[in-house]
Every structure is written in structure tokens, then in C-alpha cells.
Amino acid sequence: QLTRAAYGLDDIEQKESRGDATLTEDMVERNELTLHNVRLNDSRPLLDIYNQLQTFRTYYQFNDMDIDRYEIDGEYEQVFIGARELSTKDLPDQAKTWVNKNLRYTHGYGVSMSHVNKVTGQGQPEYMLRNIPVEGSLDVTQPQIYFGEEDYPSVITNSKVDEFDYPTGDENATNRYEADLGIPLKGINKALFAIKEGSFRTLFSDQLTKESQLLKHRNIIDRVNEIAPFFTYDDDPYIIVREDGSLAWIIDGYVRSDGYPYSEAYDGKENYIRNSVKAVVDAYSGEVNFYMVDEEDPLVQTYAKMFPDLFTEEIPEDVHAHFRYPVDLFKIQAKMYGTFHMSNLEVFYNREDYWEFPTEKYFNEDIEMDPYYITMKLAEEDKEEFILMMPYTPKKRQNMIAWMGVRNDGENYGDMFVYRFPKQKNVYGPQQIENRINQDSYISQQLNLWSQGGSKVIRGNLLVIPIEDTVLYVEPVYIESSNETSLPEVKQVIMAYEDHIVMEETFDKSLEKILKLVESGVKPEDVPEEPLDDDIEEGSEDGEKEQDESEDV
């Protein structure tokens, strides 16, 4: 009981799910938005694609891909988004001059965004925001990124040197930093900085002016640590596009302790954790705001009393709309709940009902599943919402016994729940589905055929998709040619429901086929094998071809 309280698990709503309801056309229609937002692109290959197709210059880099949700043209869309940051270490050697590194190359530029569930005809992501300058479905009015995830050095703005903004063919667009949050470089400040950096060029340079500012601590994690080092911070900040078109980073802050009475430690030491703080850093100005999001946490209340000016009270709506429950915290909580959901002392002592994370095949390796975000409609709700979820399997078994979720939207943010499946019924777990995919003669022959043709076959994340009282399983298949410049392309979608497994070119085709099999009452062993189809195009040789026309996959 005390361990559950220490990890915020004492108010979890427990629910029952049959897990075996029949998938029907009506059920699909009722959950259209859930199915519309099933993630088919995976972050790992997508990051490679963004870095090849959306950087345009060697000194730009996408550090990671983040999942978020936006309302675009009245539609709730789950998206991937990445920031195009500047990496001065990747400048050509001849360009690594003092002026370039300190005065000219000062910031990254813009973001790219793509649908989680759509690809072009070539299997590449369908962009919602792309290119330089930024084009697409949202207005990005202040695309300059002076503060980000990169290990940024200090730079000087408002010098006599125009700052590089972005490339425009044979010439470059320039920019001037217009915020006033830097350190004025005049008088004693200028001398102290020159001494600290060991750069007397700063002290005597005729390129600086009275308006010149020094921008320090430009790595956003370093920046928030300088202000509030008593919190620990999530290592996966994510960037958002605000309503005014500016860019901002959201960072989850944690309060931890090793002193909670009679609570089990999750890492051998600390036995209490709360995500009580959200830090928001403006990507342009570097302004930092801390927001308290768990007012019931006594430790964060203590910090608020010690530092009364630390927290900003009012959370802007366009920021709050992008709050995500952090994966790292949820993973800790889900791990602990796998043991401490047991309330019977004898069962707990013998670990008779221990739950663990399932495994899946990802990039052709068996790995432990991570929690993942999904857009879905809970059984008792009228509309879809952003959920972070994790399936469970019993210890040393592969069937799915339950799944845990936490809500992310609006006033329901942070509400946790668990759906249990009946112990007397077998609901397939992720690894069981992976094994059945391996054993399916048609699918395995197709995958082997493409591999033998010189292409690399990559199986993406297997997603468990709860649909009312049943479960759907979806796994994308990437094909990558052997060419050095090739990119992984989504070419097939594997879908499983109960005893049926199909593989088709698109999500819609796979779903349509599953529905036909269910409605016909045909058993899987009665389904004739399909002829091998070896006409799937190999990956694009130059990795840069795209089609304007796209399709739902």
C-alpha cells in the first residue's frame, strides 16, 4: 500500500475487458479516429529519413523524433515532430573560424512534422511541415532555434556580422536576434567572458557593438539545471509549435526521494517519484517558465515556499494542450505496478500474479516493449484522446493479462487505469503474435523473397490497439535497398486479430481483409495461401524521391 502511494499508484482505476468481442464494421466506424491515428511510421527509421531529406546542409541535424498531437483543420492528428538544430561541429573545416562559430552560425531553423499514419506512394512520411523556410499546415512565424537539445556553445548576437539564418540557393538569408535575455557584452562583462573563455579575440574584436549580447547555457537541460538544480529532468524534451507560431520546448521535471517510509526502491535507492514540474523554454529567446502540475506533492510545495518566484501560476492553454505524460515515469510506475498490484499477502509473497513487460521483434531483434502513445476512445468516453499505454504478460508466459494506460488530455491528465483480461481466456500477447507472424507461410515466404533480392526487410514496432472489448495488432514492414543512399520505406502492413493474420500494402487494405475474414467465418487454416508477389519496388536509390499524392496506410 505504501509503495503504491509512493509511486502514485494508489488511485488507479481497475476495469475488466473481455478481450474477445467480435470486430465489426460498426465497431470500426465508432472508432474511426482511433484507427485513423494508428502509428505506422517508427521513430528510428523516421529520424534517418528526416536527417537525409530535411536537413539540406551538413550543419543541420535532427536529434530525435517526438510524438505529439495537434488539431489541424478541425481534425485531431497524432504527429511526429523534429527540430532542425544547428551543429557547428559539422561545419566544413575551412568554415570553422572564430567569426563563424561565435557570431555568424548562431541558431537552427524550424521544424518538420509528419503524420504517424500516412506515407507517400514510395513509403516515405507524408509531411505536414517541411523545408526551409517552413511550409505546411501550421504557421511557424519564429523558426529560429537558439536554444535546444544540441550541445550548443556560447554565441554572441547583435554584432556587426549578420547571423546566418538559412540557405537560399547561391546566397544566404540573414537574421538578427531581437530578444533581450542575453548578457550585455560591455564593460566588465566583456572582460570576464574573455578571461573565462580564454578568448582575447572577444575582448579586442572590432566586430562587437554596444548592443552585443552573450547567449550562454543554450542546451535546454543545462539551462533549467542552472535555475533549478534540485529537480531532475527527463532526457527527452520535445518541441511544440505554439498558437502564435513560435517554438518552445517542454521538459518534464521530477521530484525524487529515498526517504518514503516502507516503500520499495525502484533503482536500489530512490523510492518516491513525482512528475510535479513542467519547464517550458522558448526556443528563440531562451526564456524559461516553470509550472507546478502536481500540487499534492509535498516536496514540490516545499520548494515553492523556499523559492516563491520560481513557478509561473497560469499555464497557457496552447502549452497545456501539448503536455504529455512522460514515458520514463510511466515505465517506472508500470514496472512497480506489475508486482504491487497484488493485494493478497500470500499471493504477493509468492509472486503468483506477477506481471511483466512483453517482448516484441523490432529491427529483427527481440526486445522488451516500451510504453507508447496511442490515440483511442476509452469505452466510457464519447471521443478519442491521447493515451500512453503498456501491455502486460504474466511472468514467464506470453499471453496478455492486462494493459495499463494513463490519460494525457485536459483535466484528465495523469489519470491512470488498468484493463484486466479474464484469466480463463487466452488473449494473445505481443510475442505470441510475433511468433505467429514468423510461422505464417505466406508472410515468411514474402519476407524471405525480398531479403534474397538484395533488400533489407525491417519489422517495425508491434502495436497493441484496444478497440472497445477486443484487441487489434499492427506492425509495419520496411523495405530498404542495399544502396548506400537508400532509405527504409513502409511497404507492407501486418495486421492480426484473434487467429487471423494478414499482410497488405496499406493499413486500410489489411483492415478490410481482416473484416472480410471475420464476417465470412472462415478459419485461418481454411484461408488459401496467396501467390508470392515479388513486384514490390526496392527502396529509392537516391533516397530523395517523393510523391505529392499520398495514401492512408
Residue ranges and their predicted role:
Residues Q1-V553:
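Soluble extracytoplasmic regions of secretory-pathway and membrane proteins
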